[in-house]
Amino acid sequence: MTARLRPVLAGLPVYVPGKTVPGAIKLASNETVFGPLPSVRAAIEHATQSINRYPDNGCLAVKAALARHVSSLSAADFGPEHIAVGCGSVSLCQQLVQITASVGDEVIFGWRSFELYPPQVQVAGATAIQVPLTNHTFDLEAMLAAVTERTRLIIVCNPNNPTSTVVQPEALAEFVRSVPPHILVAIDEAYVEYLRDGTVPDSPHLVRTHSNVVVLRTFSKAYGLAGLRVGYAVGQPDVIAALDKVYVPFTVSSLAQAAAIASVQAADELLARTDAVVAERGRVSAELRAAGFTVPPSQANFVWLPLEDRTTDFVTQAAKAHIVVRPYGADGVRVTIAAPEENDALLRFARCWITHRDGAR
């Protein structure tokens, strides 16, 4: 007899990560090319001495360090009670859905955006309301218009993954002010460290001025800890307490906690590395545009190529050139900004590809 499983799971897509192909240039997962700093490596090594013990389930030292760090970057002050820690910001996003939405409820987000939002909402039994993007970024007015009495959560991915675009700080603040206060607004800032050109919002300050705002951040991108899985949320104490209630115990390892604390202590040195990525982002974007590609202005560590029906061919031909990029259906391709020599290889391929495509028309 077959076990009875939840019917909703039958149509649930399995998450497909960016491919890793031996010998190929991987531009599919938005990983940093920089390894951990020596101080972070030392903290990880020291933490291995006690891996026979369970990690601190409350992540108390991490929360204290993050509260100081976030306070130093914001116009507002925060304590550990304002911080939740999770197994990457993706886990915290799932926890947010769990504490806000169930059967009959609605969760709003722009689309296309982070591809795990829809299944996370579906697993909770809620309904995902996907609001189409305008010019590859969030249409905040349309998202507000989509609010109903069933809306429980709104997610704003900023910068947006995979389109790399950003909502301007003033527009984000006005949006938050316009959302009914009983609806939680989650600002997913996995790529916030790559923001430049006056686009950096003081989103933690929005947490202190609006009780329904929570900010998600991660150590997987700019901090280079993707393999250790640690992220955090900044929110009001009641929201944080609810997140902690649905946290799966011990999922943030002692190694991850030690690395996170050491990374925060070396934040200035680590984040200085993002300048090199931003410079390469500008160069790659400019050269792709010069070659004939449409490239929305990026504020992340990747660029978006809205190739539509040409997506599959681009990805297939890139793989033949030993370059792995990330396709998104028939919408487009996301390309990670990597080391200069890897970016050069991508540019050589892209020029050849678009020349061949244009010549074949």
UniProtKB/Swiss-Prot annotation:
Keyword presence, Transferase: yes
Biological process annotations from GO: L-histidine biosynthetic process
Residue ranges that the Swiss-Prot or TrEMBL entry lists as coiled coil: none
Cofactors: pyridoxal 5'-phosphate
Catalytic activity as recorded in UniProt: an aromatic L-alpha-amino acid + 2-oxoglutarate = an aromatic oxo-acid + L-glutamate
Entry similarity comment: Belongs to the class-II pyridoxal-phosphate-dependent aminotransferase family.
Biological function: Aminotransferase that catalyzes the conversion of aromatic amino acids and 2-oxoglutarate into corresponding aromatic oxo acids and L-glutamate.
Protein name, per record: Aromatic amino acid aminotransferase
